[in-house]
Amino acid sequence: MDQPRKLHIKSFGCQMNVYDAQRMVDALAPEGFVETQSADDADLVILNTCHIREKAAEKVYSELGKLRLLKQDAASHGRRFEIAVAGCVAQAEGAEIIRRQPAVDVVVGPQSYHHLPELLEKARRDGRALETEFPIEDKFGVLPPPRPDAIRARGVSAFVTVQEGCDKFCSFCVVPYTRGAEMSRPVAKILDDVKRLIDNGVREITLIGQNVNAYHGEGPDDRPWTLGALLRHLASVPGVARLRYSTSHPLDVDDELIAAHRELPGLMPFVHLPVQSGSDAILAAMNRRHSADDYRRVIDRFRQADPSIAFSSDFIVGFPGETDRDFEATLALVTQIGYAGAYSFKYSPRPGTPAAELQEMVAPAVMDQRLEQLQGLIDSQQAAFNRASIGTTVDVLFERAARHPGQIVGRTAYLQPAHVMAADDIVGQVLPVTIHSLERYSLIGELVKPQPARPPKPLPVTTGA
């Protein structure tokens, strides 16, 4: 019997890439590959790349330089070592990756992961393989389903892609060019995925997409369903304890999604809703197609539906033309909304996007100062949100053993890590925890002990006449 070959995938960026990495593992399992956590002992390394953040391509080339040395060492010992570049940098850079780093065997875009086995075979035969086209077939329909043992090994929370691509064309963003137009999967296929996960121990499902609330997949009634309708359908699946979704666009928040938050107990009250800036002038330059007040009104609709709801967001500082007044508007928005957490980034131009042609660049030192100030405000809000948990009892889905012996870690409805001392048989259960302290960004608490059942009241004693 052939020895299994070892596969290591290093993922950068978004939740979609985490999911895609799992699907690549599933696609290569029938070829005899098993996953390893180290590139050093791998036979195939895949860099699963993201093109959103600063210097994304250069980070990939830096990683490839390290992998080239591993490939040379493997060759000196008579061992085959293969390198593949996947994801959005692969889609954007294409053949340039192989030109700059000839050690690369395969370059594959996000829509072609189901072709990985054939691409590896082609690379072994011809020396290189490149596929960055947008194939006609739905990759989700041809990727093999994950094996039961793989699902169980990945834990009690799982991602399910329901939508991919984006039609919004924000001026700074490469996603429409690297992931293509919006595509939604049929409800029936999503339901099959969810049931398979639940049957193998998953308790929490996160529906993901580049613009997930633009979901419009075909329902059982042959009509397009919204994300709200899909969530309602999945909430009725036995065994689904929690539902989440990410990432959303303010323009696509509709009445059905708001109603789902009002009516579905299993839909977690935590929404990632990027806004990018609090300045209307900058939002217009970003082609966001909404104002800061439009965003505030969307937040208000969510809070009216569920007062317990909390938010995270994304912000870009230093977008071309951003003035001090524009930045102050962003700080004002953050102060008014009050976030449980958020991510902030310095603007960096993405080649091929409209914003890359803008000339009014903000000085790097100003960007640094604004980023520090904004992230400081966000961090203070997150700390206050976490402190408010002390003394309360919250439901926690327990996921795994923690680093400290005897400690189990799970997550609250707001994705806060929560640690308790307990036996590991609570993994996979949602249990109440009383929070008594914080440790950095984690909550520390104790399981609420079940109350003993009260004995029945004795019947009144009666005497005969």
UniProtKB/Swiss-Prot annotation:
Subcellular location: Cytoplasm
Reactions catalysed according to its record: N(6)-dimethylallyladenosine(37) in tRNA + (sulfur carrier)-SH + AH2 + 2 S-adenosyl-L-methionine = 2-methylsulfanyl-N(6)-dimethylallyladenosine(37) in tRNA + (sulfur carrier)-H + 5'-deoxyadenosine + L-methionine + A + S-adenosyl-L-homocysteine + 2 H(+)
InterPro entries (UniProt xref): Elp3/MiaA/NifB-like_rSAM, Methylthiotransferase, Methylthiotransferase_CS, Methylthiotransferase_N, Methylthiotransferase_N_sf, MiaB_methiolase, rSAM, rSAM_horseshoe
Domain called TRAM: residue spans: 387-449
Cofactor binding description: Binds 2 [4Fe-4S] clusters. One cluster is coordinated with 3 cysteines and an exchangeable S-adenosyl-L-methionine.
A Pfam family it matches: Radical_SAM
Keyword 4Fe-4S: yes
MTTase N-terminal domain sequence ranges: 5-125
Keywords from the named record: 4Fe-4S, Cytoplasm, Iron, Iron-sulfur, Metal-binding, S-adenosyl-L-methionine, Transferase, tRNA processing
Cofactor (UniProt): [4Fe-4S] cluster
Cellular component annotations (GO), alphabetically ordered: cytosol
Domain of life: Bacteria
Residues annotated as domain Radical SAM core: 152-382
SUPFAM superfamilies: Radical SAM enzymes
Binding-site residues for [4Fe-4S] cluster 2, renumbered to this chain: 166, 170, 173
GO MF entry, a single one: metal ion binding
E.C. no: 2.8.4.3
Binding annotation for [4Fe-4S] cluster 1: 14, 50, 88
HAMAP family listed in its UniProt record: tRNA_metthiotr_MiaB (MF_01864)
Subunit organization: Monomer.
Physiological role: Catalyzes the methylthiolation of N6-(dimethylallyl)adenosine (i(6)A), leading to the formation of 2-methylthio-N6-(dimethylallyl)adenosine (ms(2)i(6)A) at position 37 in tRNAs that read codons beginning with uridine.
Protein family membership: Belongs to the methylthiotransferase family. MiaB subfamily.
PANTHER family xrefs: CDK5 REGULATORY SUBUNIT-ASSOCIATED PROTEIN 1 (PTHR43020), MITOCHONDRIAL TRNA METHYLTHIOTRANSFERASE CDK5RAP1 (PTHR43020:SF2)
Protein name (database record): tRNA-2-methylthio-N(6)-dimethylallyladenosine synthase
Organism of this sequence: Rhodopseudomonas palustris (strain BisA53)
